[in-house]
């Protein structure tokens, strides 16, 4: 029921940021034929990898299903998968059963609800990848491969991380010396120019290279934070507060389990992303928080109550920081309909007229 409730919250959130673009695409898809949609995908360059969201929007548009139900579906699945891992962790590690309520809220608050709702693609992709890693590496179930494949179809940028996952599955390990060396090297030698050269040789379309370049050396590499207040910038970093203790716990974890190997391979990636691009750092954080939590709570030994309380505090502060960062969007949202009968909320939609009245073409709010 909680997953349904969060899905309803997603339906009532205003379409700003990337969500604005996806919503306007949905409206445009209502007028397209199958052939026109195929041509649109070829022009956009999204037909090779991350075609799942546009395809889903097209199908919903042609079926007359409001776009808000796409959001509901993504958020509902996100929380259902997260809660399934919580149940698996309680089963695998009875030592934390006595603190199951605290652990549950850690899992609940660790989900970056607002980031996933506003962007849809990447946030949902990393949840699918994290759950796929859990099933494939920890549970040794081949169904994990399906979730990994779906994650790549939602957002192509998770493909390099998926490659690390397979390296861990086939026995690649990294010790603390190499982790430390790579992290220090990232700060000393890595810069956007190096990444730009790497992007140039990647086997992806020119359009995808332009998008990736924007995250490395353009506006989204960090300049976007300058458009916001210092309080917003602090709130943005605090929303990933839970990642820092999880990084330390993973660094200290020397288990030979494939899941542990995968998480430890991600540690230098986090530092590399931070050295190159703030946006890349936030994005890898979206993956590291859930997968790091999965590793921590699946351990065979009894986890320290202090560590669990620490993670709970970090998770609560992270969620509160998200609420603060997106308080302006909340002010014009339809979240007040949560106090109405559920049928009212599920029938609520954001029309093109409402969007044009409240949101600029770049996805920013008209009234701040």
Each predicted region: which residue ranges?
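Alpha-helical transmembrane segments and terminal signal-anchor/GPI-anchor hydrophobic tails
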Residues: 14-15, 20-36, 162-283, 327-356
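Short hydrophobic/aromatic helix or loop-helix immediately within or flanking a transmembrane segment
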Residues: 20, 24-28, 40-65
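Transmembrane-helix motifs of polytopic, lipid-linked glycan transferases
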Residues: 73-92
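Transmembrane-helix signature of polytopic, membrane-embedded enzymes
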Residues: 86-108
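Membrane-water interface signatures at transmembrane helix termini and the short loops
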Residues: 103, 114-129, 154, 246-303
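Membrane-interface alpha helices of multi-pass inner-membrane proteins
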Residues: 112, 143-167, 272
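Membrane-interface transmembrane helices that cradle and orient dolichyl/undecaprenyl
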Residues: 129-143
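Signature aromatic-anchored transmembrane alpha helix within multi-pass, membrane-resident enzymes
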Residues: 303-323
């Amino acid at each position: 029921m909680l997953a349904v409730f969060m899905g309803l919250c997603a339906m009532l959130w205003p379409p700003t940021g990337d969500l604005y673009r996806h919503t306007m695409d949905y409206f445009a898809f209502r007028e397209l034929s199958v052939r026109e949609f195929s041509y649109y995908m070829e022009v956009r360059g999204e037909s090779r990898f991350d075609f799942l969201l546009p395809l889903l929007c097209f199908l919903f548009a042609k079926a007359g299903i409001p776009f808000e139900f796409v959001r509901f579906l993504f958020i509902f699945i996100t929380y259902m998968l997260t809660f399934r891992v919580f149940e698996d962790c309680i089963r695998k590690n009875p030592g934390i059963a006595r603190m199951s309520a605290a652990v549950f809220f850690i899992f609940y608050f660790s989900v970056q609800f607002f980031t996933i709702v506003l962007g849809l693609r990447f946030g949902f992709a990393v949840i699918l990848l994290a759950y796929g890693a859990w099933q494939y590496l920890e549970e040794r179930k081949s169904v994990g491969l399906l979730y990994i494949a779906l994650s790549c179809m939602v957002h192509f940028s998770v493909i390099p991380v998926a490659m690390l996952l397979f390296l861990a599955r086939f026995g690649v390990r990294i010790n603390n010396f190499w982790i430390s060396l790579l992290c220090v090297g990232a700060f000393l030698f890595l810069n956007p120019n190096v990444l730009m050269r790497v992007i140039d040789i990647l086997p992806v379309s020119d359009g995808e290279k332009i998008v990736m370049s924007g995250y490395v050396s353009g506006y989204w590499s960090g300049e976007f934070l300058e458009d916001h207040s210092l309080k917003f910038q602090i709130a943005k970093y605090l929303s990933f507060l839970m990642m820092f203790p999880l990084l330390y716990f993973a660094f200290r974890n020397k288990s030979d389990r494939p899941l542990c190997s995968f998480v430890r391979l991600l540690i230098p990636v986090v530092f590399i992303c931070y050295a190159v691009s703030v946006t890349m750092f936030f994005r890898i954080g979206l993956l590291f928080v859930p997968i790091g939590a999965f590793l921590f709570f699946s351990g065979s030994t009894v986890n320290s109550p202090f560590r669990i309380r620490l993670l709970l505090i970090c998770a609560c502060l992270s969620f509160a920081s998200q609420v603060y960062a997106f308080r302006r969007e909340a002010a014009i949202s339809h979240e007040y309909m949560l106090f109405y009968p559920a049928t009212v909320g599920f029938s609520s939609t954001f029309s093109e007229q409402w969007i044009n009245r409240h949101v600029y073409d770049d996805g920013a709010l008209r009234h701040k």
